[in-house]
């Protein structure tokens, strides 16, 4: 009798799970973007939202909740109902860096947020102001060594991923640079173009048009191979500094406790969207980014390694926000 009851219960649960996946989404879905409108993450989020709206027949809305190095947006999603209707477009600070940079967070990135799909990575390019008398990485390094602490670089703020990346670049190159923190890439790149600061590490996408127009000078790309949209920009290895590799990544996470069937559906349908030729050309490889497309299990494994890497880097750089 007990065995029969258990079998019936399992069957009912299986049917319920399948039905849940088939009926989701039954109402509008929110994608929370932890940055202001118009930036790289926002554009990506809106591109995915538009395609998922078509696929699901339900509106997928983007909400911008910028501030506090993505903490505001992450807390909102972590404390939302675990039903799949609130999705965070997270990046490496959200899930890997902030827990080591801040002594207290209002969310636990491991316990409170569940990986869905790792979408893409954005490898950085070193850009300098066009008037700077350095046309190669080695010329820049020589200039920095001759003028220690004088050359300036911009980042998204103290303790940001771009801050850590540039500190690591300085250590590997044996140079000392002067840090000028900004609020985001929308402030950093104009400062480089105007000569307010000398250089910055940037994702390719927001810098691409200005590199092509000559308003920014690109000296090195931090990937294993050259980027197809910047074929004349050497890798750091080609430029004489092997081993320097930096990247940011973007992926979906949901509140812990979200049904597995809903997570799998979001992952599968997002994968369909991002692997089309049209989407890739408009939002990924066509603007200098690289597809990752890792499902929930692979994404979780990736995060374990990424967190360990950030723990080491924060310790070595000796930078903390509080």
Predicted segments with their positions:
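Short coil/turn segments
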Residues: 38, 92-93, 129-134, 155-160, ...
């Amino acid at each position: 009798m007990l065995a029969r009851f258990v079998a019936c219960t399992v069957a009912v649960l299986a049917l319920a799970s399948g039905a849940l996946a088939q009926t989701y989404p039954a109402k509008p879905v929110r994608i929370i973007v932890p940055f202001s409108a118009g930036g790289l993450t926002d554009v990506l989020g809106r591109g995915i939202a538009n395609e998922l709206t078509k696929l699901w027949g339900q509106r997928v809305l983007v909400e911008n909740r910028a501030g506090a190095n993505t903490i505001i947006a992450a807390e909102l999603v972590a404390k939302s109902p675990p039903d799949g209707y609130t999705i965070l477009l997270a990046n490496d600070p959200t899930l890997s860096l902030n827990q080591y940079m801040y002594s207290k967070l209002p969310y636990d990135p491991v316990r409170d947020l569940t990986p869905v799909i790792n979408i893409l990575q954005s490898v950085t390019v070193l850009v300098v102001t066009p008037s700077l008398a350095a046309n190669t990485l080695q010329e820049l390094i020589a200039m920095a060594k001759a003028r220690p602490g004088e050359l300036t670089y911009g980042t998204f703020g103290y303790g940001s991923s771009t801050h850590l990346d540039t500190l690591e670049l300085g250590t590997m190159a044996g140079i000392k640079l002067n840090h000028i923190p900004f609020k985001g890439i929308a402030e950093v790149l104009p400062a480089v173009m105007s000569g307010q600061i000398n250089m910055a590490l940037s994702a390719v996408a927001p810098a691409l048009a200005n590199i092509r127009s000559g308003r920014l000078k690109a000296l090195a790309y931090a990937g294993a191979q050259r980027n197809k949209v910047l074929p004349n920009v050497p890798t750091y290895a080609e430029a004489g500094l092997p081993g320097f590799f930096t990247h940011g990544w973007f992926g979906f996470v949901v509140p812990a406790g979200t049904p597995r069937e809903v997570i799998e559906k979001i992952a599968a349908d997002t994968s369909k969207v991002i692997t089309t030729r049209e989407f890739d050309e408009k939002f990924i490889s066509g603007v200098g980014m690289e597809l990752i497309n890792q499902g929930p299990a692979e994404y979780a494994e990736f995060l374990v390694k990424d967190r360990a890497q950030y723990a080491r880097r924060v310790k070595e750089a000796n930078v903390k926000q509080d």
